Amino acid sequence: LEEDVEILGPPVVELDLSSNQSVAMVAVRLSDILPDDKATRVTYGLLNLTHRNSHEHLEPLEPGKRYRVRIQMNDIAQRFPAGNRIRLAISTVYWPLAWPSPTPARLTVYRKTSRLILPVRPVNPRDKEVRPFAPPEGAPPLNKTLIQPTRQSWTVIRDLAKDESRLEVINDEGVYRIEDIDLEVASKVIENYVFCDDDYDSLRGETKWERRFKRGAW
């Protein structure tokens, strides 16, 4: 980008596409790409293509036929700095956010007749007059001591022998002590999702949430 670009509202993707299956899904993601190629997802949108005209009356696709579909992403307010790039990614799955189609589908997207519509916020001369928000008002933070640090991870494991993919998400809030009441608190969530390639009936998901409390002898 040669200059900053600000968007406010829902980005929209209009795709001219065809499918080799009667049921298919399309997922679109808008990302901010830094000069070092690190990416940050900004917003996304999903559409079951049998819902392209109505969520009430489903219409299977005719394989090979071209359709024009509109995917609206989630509303967002974002500034893309000059020097960064804006990336649009398109896929037929976005698991585990959305359950896959019953049969793997291949979509053909015709780029010349497809487009991305960004809700660009025009520059307003009065922008410089807008004062920043004051510091938020709220209760004072807990008087606590960190005993064990937090840990977050997102790991994808592929077993080529079993043709199996596994996703493990860990959100460990660590262990801390609330000093005013001498209470130790620990919280950890582990999510596991697994499926065998091309066998969507094998999809499984499990979430374990552990919370522990300790004070004195208990």
Question: What does each of the following model-derived ranges do?
Answer:
Residues 1-218:
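Glycine/threonine-rich phosphate-binding loop and adjacent beta-strand/alpha-helix elements that clamp
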